[in-house]
Amino acid sequence: MDDLTAQALKDFTARYCDAWHEEHKSWPLSEELYGVPSPCIISTTEDAVYWQPQPFTGEQNVNAVERAFDIVIQPTIHTFYTTQFAGDMHAQFGDIKLTLLQTWSEDDFRRVQENLIGHLVTQKRLKLPPTLFIATLEEELEVISVCNLSGEVCKETLGTRKRTNLASNLAEFLNQLKPLL
């Protein structure tokens, strides 16, 4: 496990939860995750769940993705997706508004790995360098990804070579995120 990335993710999650507490006097609330089982759920309303991050359980790697492509995935990606269970968190990096993706449960972790595999299949078909997404943007065809060759974090337009480097590594990127509520 990459300790710098794990700590940066935990620190951002704490900043996010603290900001939520400050503004709403509660743990984060999600309507999107209502009805989806998770160890993160503290309580449920008629149409939403309150959640708090929980330690990840299970194998702490994305080896299914590695096996599918017979490649080695950046250690920071293993760490990013296996440090904790949590709800997705809205954030800002500079002037970029994003939703930081998280695994909600062990079932969700399997789904995330399947989506990462699908993403890599498309990139391979289009002969694009491999990236692994970590966040979504309002523009559907743009994501924040980690380049699997360099470990750099970039803003990427899906299906194209258009990439803008944002940070030299994932820990640096996470440390610069500001919570958005």
UniProtKB/Swiss-Prot annotation:
Pfam name, any one: Syd
Disulphide-bonded residues: none
Membrane topology: Peripheral membrane protein
Swiss-Prot/TrEMBL keywords: Cell inner membrane, Cell membrane, Membrane
Main location: membrane
GO cellular component terms listed in the entry, alphabetical order: cytoplasmic side of plasma membrane
Cellular localization per UniProt: Cell inner membrane
Residue stretches in coiled coil: none
InterPro entries: Syd, Syd_sf
UniProt function note: Interacts with the SecY protein in vivo. May bind preferentially to an uncomplexed state of SecY, thus functioning either as a chelating agent for excess SecY in the cell or as a regulatory factor that negatively controls the translocase function.
Family according to the record: Belongs to the Syd family.
Protein name: Protein Syd
Species annotation: Shigella flexneri
